[in-house]
């Protein structure tokens, strides 16, 4: 049995986690055509909640119809979607675990057909396409920006007060709408929403303030991916000062946690970027401090996760490790890591099959876990 600091308890929002292994938010296209979570989703999250005291973060969830930028992604508006999510939440809570919903708006990164089929258009911080040859979005006007802020707030209320989520994670990463305002590679505005570090930060910070006011500071997290070049991001000259300012403001709001993602594909495209002193987010981790949890994602496996918490950040108890692909194929992942049990391999071909349980809820638990099935849940 492992004695790694991965398996020490940590305060998190209004709860206490039994370990530091977190389910990553992952888009899997398992909602129906209207964005209502299918029953597969309840099974998926319940399986991964089976080790008591686990933290789960959901798929990216559209906050309103115009932010649903892809088919078969879930939403959190209207009573039918809220009710379906409540079933998921109740099942997770019955296992003794915790679940936070990720609030999402796609902006220029949306699938154009998914919008135009509903009479909607691409919108972003500026008229800058996600890549050369891709459709050019409209620059959102002042009224639209204010409405987006309200939509995030309502989405948070629907999640926490309606569906019973333990909190919400605001998706500010991976080139989606908040990132499109935050980074000058996309944001070319000259009004109060662009043109300076402070102005580019304004959209994400106003959203965060509104959500904090709506559901409480200890129910709000933020995900960022400073170094990701996915969807046209990560190429600005003042990247470190931009994110230093943004993270400082988040810290002052006393939100529950910060989630930082490193990008494996950035390293594959440009291995030299690894030599930048801030590439692995150490500067931002230090800025965040030791008071509140910080989630770190970036292709971790069991060995690198242990090194992260036991060596790199051995001086702090607030670093949690986010797993995606390995959690897909190992619903009992925390148990396997603690007991030193080999991981099952994942199948990429089944990651994104719409409306299907294949490769989603059909990975088995290990025999050692099942031998304890008479317990309500396995202690983390």
Curated annotation (Swiss-Prot):
Ligand binding (FMN): 25-27, 60, 102, 171, 223, 299, 324-325
Positions with a binding annotation for substrate: 171, 174, 352
The keyword Manganese is assigned to this record: no
Keyword set includes Disulfide bond: no
Listed SUPFAM superfamilies: FMN-linked oxidoreductases
Keywords: Flavoprotein, FMN
A GO molecular function held by the record: NADPH dehydrogenase activity
Family, as annotated: Belongs to the NADH:flavin oxidoreductase/NADH oxidase family.
UniProt function note: Probable inactive dehydrogenase; part of the gene cluster that mediates the biosynthesis of fungal ergot alkaloid. DmaW catalyzes the first step of ergot alkaloid biosynthesis by condensing dimethylallyl diphosphate (DMAP) and tryptophan to form 4-dimethylallyl-L-tryptophan. The second step is catalyzed by the methyltransferase easF that methylates 4-dimethylallyl-L-tryptophan in the presence of S-adenosyl-L-methionine, resulting in the formation of 4-dimethylallyl-L-abrine.
Protein name in UniProt: Probable inactive dehydrogenase easA
């Amino acid at each position: 049995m492992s004695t790694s600091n991965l398996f020490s308890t940590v305060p998190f929002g209004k709860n206490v986690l039994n370990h530091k292994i977190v389910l990553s938010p992952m888009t899997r296209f398992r909602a129906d055509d209207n964005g209502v979570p299918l029953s597969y989703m309840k099974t998926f999250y319940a399986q991964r909640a089976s080790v008591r005291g686990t933290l789960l973060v959901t798929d990216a969830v559209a906050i309103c119809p115009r932010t649903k930028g892809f088919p078969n992604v879930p939403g959190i508006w209207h009573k039918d979607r809220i009710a379906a999510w409540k079933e998921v939440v109740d099942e997770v809570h019955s296992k003794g675990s915790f679940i936070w919903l990720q609030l999402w708006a796609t902006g220029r990164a949306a699938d154009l057909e998914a919008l135009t089929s509903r009479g909607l258009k691409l919108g972003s911080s500026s008229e800058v396409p996600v890549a050369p040859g891709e459709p050019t979005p409209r620059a959102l006007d002042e009224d639209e920006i204010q409405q987006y802020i309200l939509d995030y707030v309502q989405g948070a209320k629907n999640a926490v007060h309606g569906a019973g989520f333990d909190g919400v994670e605001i998706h500010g990463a991976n080139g989606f709408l908040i990132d499109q305002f935050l980074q000058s590679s996309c944001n070319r505005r000259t009004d109060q929403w662009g043109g300076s570090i402070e102005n580019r930060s304004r959209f994400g910070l106003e959203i965060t303030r509104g959500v904090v006011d709506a559901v409480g500071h200890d129910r709000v997290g933020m995900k960022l991916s400073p170094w990701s070049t996915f969807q046209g991001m990560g190429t600005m000259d003042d990247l470190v000062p931009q994110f230093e300012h943004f993270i400082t403001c988040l810290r002052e709001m006393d939100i529950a946690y910060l989630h930082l993602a490193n990008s494996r594909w950035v390293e594959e495209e440009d291995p030299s970027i690894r030599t930048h002193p801030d590439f692995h987010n150490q500067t931002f981790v230090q800025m965040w401090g030791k008071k509140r949890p910080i989630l770190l994602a970036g292709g971790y496996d069991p060995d690198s996760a242990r090194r992260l918490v036991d060596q790199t950040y051995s001086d702090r108890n607030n670093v949690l490790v986010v797993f995606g692909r390995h959690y897909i194929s190992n619903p009992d992942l925390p148990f396997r890591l603690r007991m030193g049990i080999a991981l099952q391999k994942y199948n990429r071909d089944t990651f994104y099959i719409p409306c299907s349980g294949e490769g989603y809820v059909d990975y088995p638990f290990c025999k050692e876990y099942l031998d304890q099935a008479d317990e309500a849940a396995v202690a983390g």
